[in-house]
């Protein structure tokens, strides 16, 4: 029942944030729409940002599990590669696009996402360092973890920023630039 209540609250919150904007929806609004007490919302989520990132722990467990729970015949690098490819597939889903568009719309959510990534990086560094195939140096372990998490960020960036990139690439394309007298295209 607790997990179902938590999931219901998170789904309602995400819908409200997406429909009305993150900054325009309060915890009381979420509680009212989810038909629970405000104290129930806070019993499940420590902050408003945590409502959006309700899968934070699951994501970290999946990253660490990609290293710790891989099959004996799979190398450390191949396990991380497979996890990154799963992330790329997820980032191309409509749900992901909507989610990351919401995150990009709020400075508070971007900040929370950055802090979350730092926690995930530390957990992944620990998992990599304790692996038998771990690189010899702590710096190499950290670099491998950072590369993996940066690949996640890069996978999501084109999707959430596509409208901005499309607009800037159109305005900077040769066809959209004013022509100089005597240039080849004006001849």
What would you call each of these model-derived segments?
Residues 61-101:
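Hydrophobic alpha-helical connector segments
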Residues 126, 161-187:
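C-terminal peripheral helix-coil segments that are non-catalytic and often amphipathic
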Residues 1-20, 24-36, 53, 62:
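Basic, helix-initiating cap at the start of DNA-binding domains
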Residues 5, 55, 59, 84, ...:
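Hydrophobic/aromatic residues within well-ordered alpha-helical segments
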Residues 49-51:
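A secondary-structure capping/hinge motif
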Residues 36-45:
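Short hydrophobic/aromatic patch on the recognition helix
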Residues 107-133, 138-146:
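Amphipathic alpha-helical packing segments from all-alpha helical-bundle domains
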């Amino acid at each position: 029942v607790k997990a179902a209540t938590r999931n219901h609250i998170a789904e309602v919150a995400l819908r409200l944030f997406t429909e009305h904007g993150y900054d325009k929806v309060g915890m009381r609004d979420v509680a009212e729409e989810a038909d629970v007490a405000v104290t129930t919302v806070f019993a499940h989520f420590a902050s408003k940002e945590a409502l959006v990132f309700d899968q934070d722990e699951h994501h970290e467990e999946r990253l660490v599990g990609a290293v710790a729970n891989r099959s004996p015949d799979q190398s450390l690098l191949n396990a991380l590669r497979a996890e990154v490819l799963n992330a790329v597939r997820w980032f191309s889903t409509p749900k992901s696009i909507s989610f990351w568009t919401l995150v990009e719309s709020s400075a508070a959510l971007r900040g929370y996402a950055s802090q979350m990534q730092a926690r995930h990086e530390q957990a992944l560094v620990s998992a990599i360092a304790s692996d038998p195939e771990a690189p010899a140096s702590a710096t190499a372990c950290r670099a491998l973890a950072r590369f993996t998490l940066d690949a996640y960020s890069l996978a999501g960036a084109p999707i959430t920023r596509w409208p901005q990139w499309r607009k800037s690439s159109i305005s900077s394309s040769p066809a959209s630039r004013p022509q100089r007298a005597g240039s080849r295209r004006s001849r």
